Amino acid sequence: MNNILVINGPNLNLLGKREPDMYGNITLENINQKIKLHFKNEDLKIDFFQSNEEGKIIDKIIESQKKYNAIVINPAAYSHYSIAILDAMRSINIPAVEVHLSNIYKREEYRKKSVTAEASLGVISGFGYYGYIMAIEFILNNLVREK
């Protein structure tokens, strides 16, 4: 069985309430359910983790290489400045795909740069919750199934 960890960063626990014009009314729990439902017929275990604390996210990234084939990460605001998360992602020997619900390139200038993307295979941005599904499909089709 393949194991994938989905990591969500700060304020994503507020989805459904926070900036509905930007993110819609979907909650993080709804997103997690949609992801699980989409992959229900796969030989795949998906775990979910969310934290508003940078250190907890770093610890989870470092621990992930013991249990998971890959990670999907939405570092949220940390993507724009967290060298610590970047370094943690570089330190693990499993692939990562970065996801953003909104198109960060259509937002404020300070949101258009993702330092954490440097440690990711790629970035999926602007497709809402479906970006997580796209990331997992990429991982399964290009990294896990070919082994």
Curated annotation (Swiss-Prot):
GO molecular function, one term: 3-dehydroquinate dehydratase activity
Binding site for substrate: 74, 80, 87, 101-102, 111
Keyword list, A-Z: Amino-acid biosynthesis, Aromatic amino acid biosynthesis, Lyase
Record-marked site positions (Transition state stabilizer): 18
PANTHER family xref list: CATABOLIC 3-DEHYDROQUINASE
Protein family: Belongs to the type-II 3-dehydroquinase family.
Positions annotated as active site in the UniProt record: 23 (proton acceptor), 100 (proton donor)
The protein's name: 3-dehydroquinate dehydratase
One of the protein's GO biological processes: aromatic amino acid family biosynthetic process
Catalytic activity: 3-dehydroquinate = 3-dehydroshikimate + H2O
Role this protein plays: Catalyzes a trans-dehydration via an enolate intermediate.
Pathway involvement of the protein, from the record: Metabolic intermediate biosynthesis; chorismate biosynthesis; chorismate from D-erythrose 4-phosphate and phosphoenolpyruvate: step 3/7
Description of how the protein assembles with itself and partners: Homododecamer.
Listed PROSITE patterns: DEHYDROQUINASE_II
EC number of this enzyme: 4.2.1.10
SUPFAM superfamilies reported for this sequence: Type II 3-dehydroquinate dehydratase (SSF52304)
